Amino acid sequence: GLGDYRRVHVVSCQDTDITPTGLGAYASRQTYVAGFSIRQTGLLLKEKILDYSAKLTRQAVYNMDIVDGSIVRTTDGKVLMSLSELAMHAQYNPNDSQHITAESTYTIRNNAYSFGCTFAEVEVDIPMCKVTLKDIINVHDCGRLVNPALAEAQVHGGMSMAIGYGLSEQLLFDEKTGRPLNNNLLDYKLSTIMDHPHLEAQFVENAEPTSAFGTKALGEPPACSGAPAIRNAIYNATGVAIDQDPITPHVLFRRFTEEGLIRD
């Protein structure tokens, strides 16, 4: 139907000049992004269910709703049939058997920003150039929590990552060959539960008005503010500002020596 095959262009290497416009990732916002399509598809499926139930109950669609797994009449709340009964009818009715499904596509037009902060308490042994993290609290406004337990676990994971890249995790390379020198868990100092104090996560639930379910991002944000909070706590304790991470004993020794806290 095109008339000329040269009108067809196969794109093998994509860049921003030819791909559709994107509004950005803005951290891990899967619930935010997928929520629009989930809600839209759910409403479409509900519409199809009520359409089919209208045939079985001889009720008007606008006079029915789905409540607690049942089709109910909105005027008096009477249960007309359960969803399981409707599913059996839809599947095995010899006269009108059908699969009730719904599909939809939703293009995201909005973005939502998450807000959060971290409070850290440290103990610094200046002669030993050692930092001990005594306490850390991570607070986030991630919109309405869909799964509080999973949200808390997500924050704990981000805090652990922040402690790691803030104090110990550093990938070393051979300057001549570019070969990684510590590409294993023995030499790469990944923080573990033995390096952590109690990890406390708190939430401020401000529902996002542009979101289908009031949610916002909670993927990367917990890992962002932890290391800067530890750095600022070290500065508050010693008066020494450090502009790199991880803040290892070697870095502390160099900076403490430069500031006169350690003398040869």
Model-inferred region functions:
Residues 1-264:
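C-terminal catalytic domains of large/alpha subunits in multi-subunit enzymes
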